[in-house]
Amino acid sequence: MQKFIIHKGIACPLEYANIDTDQIIPKQFLLAVSKQGFGKHLFHDLRYLDDKESVLNMDFNLNKKEYQNSSILVSFENFGSGSSREHAPWALVDYGIRAIIAPSFADIFKNNALGNGLLTIELAKDEVLEIVDELKKSQDKNIEISLLEKRVFFKDKIFSFDLDDFHRICLLEGLDNIALTLKHEAQIKAYEKNSKSFLV
């Protein structure tokens, strides 16, 4: 998992509330079990005008020239609602999204996202609206995020956010659940060696 310490990138506003996991990655693309290859299907029904993904919907912000190569999304309430599919953060990460800023996230999506290296940042609704408004009228779409400081830097404004220590450390060190377990492999083996065996 890629470390997240400081990231600066183009931010794209998605002015929708309740973006659900089926909108993020529709069910017909869930056959694969690898984390790679989902990015091209991200927001399929919003990004494309046809099922073959050959005609782009140019009214959708991610398809607009000024938001190409976006690595940060700024959206509205309850991002990631719906089913618990882990493919949703896989698709976002595979597309190149490193962070999402919103007033709130669905709990399961948030945990899945953080576990896959995708930073979820909760800001007050008025702060999100301020960022969205500035993104739409400014030529400079770049936002800087410091996970070390737990701050978002945009123009001359600084927005502070919170994140629990466990997920913050995992992101700073680039540790997913497997890597975190392996980090404590010696302690686990020592515990197993010193523990009594019981027949079940």
From Swiss-Prot:
| Record has Amino-acid biosynthesis as a keyword | yes
Q: Which SUPFAM superfamilies match?
A: LeuD/IlvD-like (SSF52016)
| Gene Ontology cellular component list | 3-isopropylmalate dehydratase complex
* Molecular functions per Gene Ontology: 3-isopropylmalate dehydratase activity
Q: What are the UniProt keywords, alphabetically?
A: Amino-acid biosynthesis, Branched-chain amino acid biosynthesis, Leucine biosynthesis, Lyase
**Sequence similarity:** Belongs to the LeuD family. LeuD type 1 subfamily.
- Chain's role: Catalyzes the isomerization between 2-isopropylmalate and 3-isopropylmalate, via the formation of 2-isopropylmaleate.
- The entry's protein name is 3-isopropylmalate dehydratase small subunit
| Record gene name | leuD
